[in-house]
Amino acid sequence: MTTLKITGMTCDSCAAHVKEALEKVPGVQSALVSYPKGTAQLAIEAGTSSDALTTAVAGLGYEATLADAPPTDNRAGLLDKMRGWIGAADKPSGNERPLQVVVIGSGGAAMAAALKAVEQGAHVSLIERGTIGGTCVNVGCVPSKIMIRAAHIAHLRRESPFDGGIAATVPAIDRSKLLAQQQARVEELRHAKYEGILDGNPAITVVHGEARFKDEQSLVVRLNDGGERVVAFDRCLVATGASPAVPPIPGLKESPYWTSTEALVSDTLPERLAVIGSSVVALELAQAFARLGSQVTILARNTLFFRDDPAIGEAVTAAFRAEGIKVLEHTQASQVAHVDGEFVLTTGYGEIRADQLLVATGRAPNTRSLALEAAGVAANAQGAIVIDKGMRTSTPHIYAAGDCTDQPQFVYVAAAAGTRAAINMTGGDAALDLTAMPAVVFTDPQVATVGYSEAEAHHDGIETDSRTLTLDNVPRALANFDTRGFIKLVIEEGSGRLIGVQAVAPEAGELIQTAVLAIRNRMTVQELADQLFPYLTMVEGLKLAAQTFSKDVKQLSCCAG
């Protein structure tokens, strides 16, 4: 019996593919591959090449060494032989060829789908017109959270609840150095989590160019280095994401305004920043720039968080105004001018002047250039691709996932949708259930929600009961000397089952997943109250909020069970 040590496997399906590859090597009688142990136990004929074994595994993107021998790099020339033995990932076993899957895009949905499809035995062609990695790692989640964190630290140096004992200072902010640090981490993560993974997987072919449908079975790709290529497919996933939407305000397009993309890579901090919009992106970046030293004015068409429980918008608005951020509710710009380096915004309440303008009113699906009609793929009036719970479009073998659909615009939703689309494309049956989907807004205090608000429950005919616990009842908040915010629990009347949680609190995003699991497991509020929660954690606030349905928590000792 020969034993190989294998590194790089991430699941049982990986082990299954390694087993299949090894058993195609001449001389291998059987292979028992274990993902948890990282080993392969082989029954082989005398004279079987050990290099052939390790190269077969390497062809799948993993590394293998003989358990009783030092690693060897002597694999030159063997990869071509291995391709003949195992079919080179894009050749069939027997008379069949692998399923040909095309993925358009390279963000969260696209990557998840590509990796799952390969795991299921397909060959994937991934088409990307721009930078590998999509919005999240390049111009979205990652750089924005780095900027927000830096701004938070600057804010704490300027003022904190402990200024009486720790002298406040005015931080010297070098935006260019912060930007260099931010972009270095972006590039590091893009390579580690996207480019490196794609380069190391022989079953994925990356095509750099812009795709459009030719018909229901093929795409025309305008290659970035010139020319065009037709790419045929058995299954296709559209995962092209979304881009900042720009409202039709007279004069706006003629001005040098920012979207979030430009704001995140600017190496300067405007003295005065006007923000059109009250989207998640608008609010996160508005507070970040304010904390880094800009005078910020937000123009909100409605109130902040107007689609959510009213208490959320009230709490965040109060927090913003306390920091000196101007929040102008029910205010729209009717015209934008840029004169002598200054933006002038005309509103119903007078003019607003600023050195820079950020437009963050939402995001629009990247679907206009795809020629969806050529493949019979339906989209709604906003350009979002219409899909069912299995991510199928109106053309059954064409799928879509992520921000190019009408799914909630979160990268973890996109990735989950991409994975399930790949399962369905390769013969499985998977649906995306968003009934317990968490959402987090990285303002300070943070906003975190899951499940129903009271208004949403009533709209669906569900009778509710609710309790709101202010943070001056949460020991962690008291110890922090920061009691801004609240935790609200919504339950189904009668059953007592938890159906929704809304939280406004520092690090609210760190407590919401506990609420997700409680809702997913159909826990009652009493069952939640009976659980053990560690003392002096913010998530303990969930237990205290649950206890308010049956008792006055103000009358409890610090850590009463």
UniProtKB/Swiss-Prot annotation:
It comes from Acinetobacter calcoaceticus. GO terms for biological process: detoxification of mercury ion. Keywords: Disulfide bond, FAD, Flavoprotein, Mercuric resistance, Mercury, Metal-binding, NADP, Oxidoreductase, Plasmid, Redox-active center. NCBIfam families: MerA (TIGR02053), PRK13748.1 (NF010311). Resistance to Hg(2+) in bacteria appears to be governed by a specialized system which includes mercuric reductase. MerA protein is responsible for volatilizing mercury as Hg(0). This is Mercuric reductase. SUPFAM superfamilies: FAD/NAD(P)-binding domain, FAD/NAD-linked reductases, dimerisation (C-terminal) domain, HMA, heavy metal-associated domain. Its EC number is 1.16.1.1.
